[in-house]
Amino acid sequence: MNDFWQHCSALLERELTPQQYVTWIKPLAPVAFDAAANTLSIAAPNRFKLDWVKSQFSGRIADMARDFWHTPIDVQFVLDPKAGMRAPAAAAPAPASARPASAPGSMGGSAGNGAAVDAAVGAVQAAQTARANGANSANNAMANLNANARAAAEQNANARAAAEDSADLDLPSLDANEAAAARRTWRPGQSAGSNGNGETDSMYERSKLNPVLTFDNFVTGKANQLARAAAIQVADNPGISYNPLFLYGGVGLGKTHLIHAIGNQLLMDKAGARIRYIHAEQYVSDVVKAYQRKAFDDFKRYYHSLDLLLIDDIQFFSGKSRTQEEFFYAFEALVANKAQVIITSDTYPKEISGIDDRLISRFDSGLTVAIEPPELEMRVAILMRKAQSEFVSLNEDVAFFVAKHLRSNVRELEGALRKILAYSKFHGREITIEVTKEALKDLLTVQNRQISVENIQKTTADFYSIKVADMYSKKRPANIARPRQIAMYLAKELTQKSLPEIGELFGGRDHTTVLHAVRKIADERSKDAQLNHELHVLEQTLKG
């Protein structure tokens, strides 16, 4: 078992970045191997690490175990018993005077209930002693100790309530006393609440960052190169370059990956940086809970003191006036303190409905960057990179086939690849284009049914207020020719039709006419922000 783990650790150390290896793999330890049941148990030091390693590395470790023992191995992750150890109970209760008093407000281990338990044990002990000395003494002892037990229980309940207030607001994962102390005593260059033990875990737990999402594994192409460049600039100069940075684009295009990458970079560059990633829905929930519990002082103190706030999918603020008001104050405080704010949305800022004009103007005061659906070459690169991370050799022809048929977003591509890998493994077949077609049969059918050239023509005509018939006509005024070229471009991008087929559907035009339109619009899109925005709206409308 230990030989295997040394072998496994050595391989993972070569495959992962030093930060990933030290954070996730090094703290693990094999604790049991059952040869009869073919099960291997690996212990993690805490629940956070256990859940993350199980979701991210279990498949790779299981593959290594199978190769090592030449048989399938069920890899199970367990919590290290030492992590949950409590002080063993004494053989007999010690006298009350001999027992150390619990520290006021202590929340560590079982101390939360310790005072109440100690008082209850003492009450029983005193009552037994009192029987020998007379009923009156027993009654007096029991009355006194019951009062102590009630007081201890009340103290414990108050401590729990304070901790629940902090936890409910999704503030850093500290108990009430630690959280208050961290908010009071934090200084630049010092990690809040860090005591040197499990510091990396604490940083990630407090910041809510995903350490796997970095600039190194972000696939770059024309569709996202500007957004990536802006993100790197902000990570290098937080609070100075582009504040706020507003990234917008459809689902699964890499917005969340980029903002986590910024946070991870800053966490590495600046020891003790106060960083928080939060989804807009969670922020709304925090505002509601702060209102219910009258805890706005703690709420403001926490959010207003951050160095970097990463807020995802801000369109969820729509129509929520109290949340918008609190965020406006937080935004103003952060920018005034030269802290960085980064926001994502699925829509251009001015088109988010139900958002206060004050906030819209703040969003526009920094840099707004669109992330577009990935082009063909980028989709292929994403598939190849993802396959590599899964330790699978993917033929480039297969990657091109998938990339040609699935065009909308990265998440869809990764989901398709997982289906292909599962299908191939289940049927014991090599990944070929034929196997890929079988694995993605339902998905490809839906894709082909979703968007038609006719639908593109109608949607584009409606958008530019012309007649659908103008798409087929020979009319050449600019107000008709331009939308027609845009529709041809979209037909090439969003359907599987060939250039001659598209030309035929546009009034029998030659394929060279279609090619000219496609190249013209593609070139102008990269230079004209207004055209790029219009195309983005059309694409999102067509994709539903």
Swiss-Prot record:
Residues 425-544 are annotated as: Domain IV, binds dsDNA. It comes from the Bacteria. GO terms for cellular component: cytoplasm; plasma membrane. Residues 208-424 are annotated as: Domain III, AAA+ region. Keywords: ATP-binding, Cytoplasm, DNA replication, DNA-binding, Lipid-binding, Nucleotide-binding. Gene3D superfamilies: 1.10.1750.10, 1.10.8.60, 3.30.300.180, P-loop containing nucleotide triphosphate hydrolases (3.40.50.300). Domain I is involved in oligomerization and binding regulators, domain II is flexibile and of varying length in different bacteria, domain III forms the AAA+ region, while domain IV binds dsDNA. Plays an essential role in the initiation and regulation of chromosomal replication. ATP-DnaA binds to the origin of replication (oriC) to initiate formation of the DNA replication initiation complex once per cell cycle. Binds the DnaA box (a 9 base pair repeat at the origin) and separates the double-stranded (ds)DNA. Forms a right-handed helical filament on oriC DNA; dsDNA binds to the exterior of the filament while single-stranded (ss)DNA is stabiized in the filament's interior. Oligomerizes as a right-handed, spiral filament on DNA at oriC. This is Chromosomal replication initiator protein DnaA.
